[in-house]
Amino acid sequence: MNIGFDMILAKLPEAYAMFDPLVDVLPVIPLLFLLLAFVWQASVSFR
């Protein structure tokens, strides 16, 4: 089981090379939601 998983993991780089820019952006998305919360609160005057 573990050997098969390692083989899948080894194949990931070439299979998903086109998604590399997407993976680089993914960690930023929660920060965007945090920023959106502040913008929303500012728009409703921090009720």
UniProtKB/Swiss-Prot annotation:
<feature type="propeptide">
    <location>
        <begin position="1"/>
        <end position="10"/>
    </location>
</feature>
<dbReference type="GO" id="GO:0009539">
    <property type="term" value="C:photosystem II reaction center"/>
</dbReference>
<dbReference type="Pfam" id="PF02533">
    <property type="entry name" value="PsbK"/>
</dbReference>
<comment type="function">
    <text>One of the components of the core complex of photosystem II (PSII). PSII is a light-driven water:plastoquinone oxidoreductase that uses light energy to abstract electrons from H(2)O, generating O(2) and a proton gradient subsequently used for ATP formation. It consists of a core antenna complex that captures photons, and an electron transfer chain that converts photonic excitation into a charge separation.</text>
</comment>
<keyword id="KW-0150">Chloroplast</keyword>
<protein>
    <recommendedName>
        <fullName>Photosystem II reaction center protein K</fullName>
    </recommendedName>
</protein>
<dbReference type="InterPro" id="IPR003687">
    <property type="entry name" value="PSII_PsbK"/>
</dbReference>
<dbReference type="GO" id="GO:0009535">
    <property type="term" value="C:chloroplast thylakoid membrane"/>
</dbReference>
<keyword id="KW-0472">Membrane</keyword>
<comment type="subunit">
    <text>PSII is composed of 1 copy each of membrane proteins PsbA, PsbB, PsbC, PsbD, PsbE, PsbF, PsbH, PsbI, PsbJ, PsbK, PsbL, PsbM, PsbT, PsbX, PsbY, PsbZ, Psb30/Ycf12, at least 3 peripheral proteins of the oxygen-evolving complex and a large number of cofactors. It forms dimeric complexes.</text>
</comment>
<keyword id="KW-0604">Photosystem II</keyword>
<keyword id="KW-0602">Photosynthesis</keyword>
<dbReference type="GO" id="GO:0015979">
    <property type="term" value="P:photosynthesis"/>
</dbReference>
<keyword id="KW-0934">Plastid</keyword>
<keyword id="KW-0793">Thylakoid</keyword>
<keyword id="KW-1133">Transmembrane helix</keyword>
<comment type="similarity">
    <text>Belongs to the PsbK family.</text>
</comment>
<feature type="transmembrane region" description="Helical">
    <location>
        <begin position="22"/>
        <end position="42"/>
    </location>
</feature>
<keyword id="KW-0674">Reaction center</keyword>
<keyword id="KW-0812">Transmembrane</keyword>
<dbReference type="InterPro" id="IPR037270">
    <property type="entry name" value="PSII_PsbK_sf"/>
</dbReference>
